[in-house]
A protein has these predicted regions:
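S-adenosyl-L-methionine
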Residues: 40-68
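Class I S-adenosyl-L-methionine
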Residues: 62-73, 80-180
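A short, Lys/Arg-enriched amphipathic alpha-helix followed by its capping loop at the start of a domain
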Residues: 20-28, 46
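Conserved SAM/SAH-binding beta-strand->alpha-helix loop
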Residues: 36
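Class I SAM-dependent methyltransferase "Motif I" SAM/SAH-binding loop
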Residues: 10-15
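The conserved SAM/SAH-binding core of class I Rossmann-like methyltransferase domains
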Residues: 33
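Extreme N-terminal starter segment of soluble prokaryotic enzymes
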Residues: 2-7
Length: 180
């Protein structure tokens, strides 16, 4: 906890983001969520003092998970492969592409002071899919803009980190929101 505020890692994986958060803040991640038992087992090994939820992020109730504690930082690393140009021309999965909406759920229910979402740069082109499950080029960015608008409507000031992160030869960007 940072000054009594929880740190939450959604889509926690093996714990890389949690380790980075801990190194940057000097505080341990309090809650980690991931649907994959192997990822949660690795996260538990790397972060034994964290409360772990091995569940779909949509199945975890933010209010219950936080148990009345305020949230200082909510971190989100939703699956990026359905946005990445590295994926190629394969059809996209609407449900996977929609995982980022869980950040708005947390924003609306527990009002984290800071929300950070990490994804590939193509995330900004998030838009509807056609019947063949391919992005509709003329509607690129529409869903992303709705997502950002919803966070703004919830009282968050949105921005993007000035520098891009390079990971496995793919550029990633951090989108952040701070409560006004």
């Amino acid at each position: 906890m940072i000054n009594g505020e929880l740190i939450v890692d959604n889509f926690a994986g093996g714990g890389g983001a949690s380790t980075g958060i801990e190194e940057a803040t000097g505080f341990s991640v309090d809650i980690a969520i991931n649907h994959d038992p192997k990822a949660i087992a690795m996260h538990k090994a790397n972060h034994p003092n964290t409360k772990h939820y091995c569940e779909d992020v949509w199945q975890v109730d933010p209010v219950q998970a936080c148990n009345g504690h305020p949230v200082g930082l909510a971190w989100f690393s939703p699956d990026c492969k359905h946005f990445s140009k590295a994926k190629g021309g394969k059809p996209k999965d609407k449900n996977i592409r929609g995982l980022a909406w869980v950040a708005c759920r947390w924003a609306g229910l527990v009002r984290p002071r800071v929300i950070m979402l990490e994804n590939v740069e193509e995330f900004k082109t998030w838009g509807p899919l056609n019947r063949g499950h391919h992005p509709i080029k003329t509607k690129q960015g529409k869903t992303f803009n709705k997502f950002v608008s919803q966070l703004q409507d919830l009282g968050y000031v949105q921005g993007a980190c000035g520098s891009r992160l390079r990971s496995a030869n793919h550029e990633k960007e951090i989108l952040y929101g701070c409560k006004m």
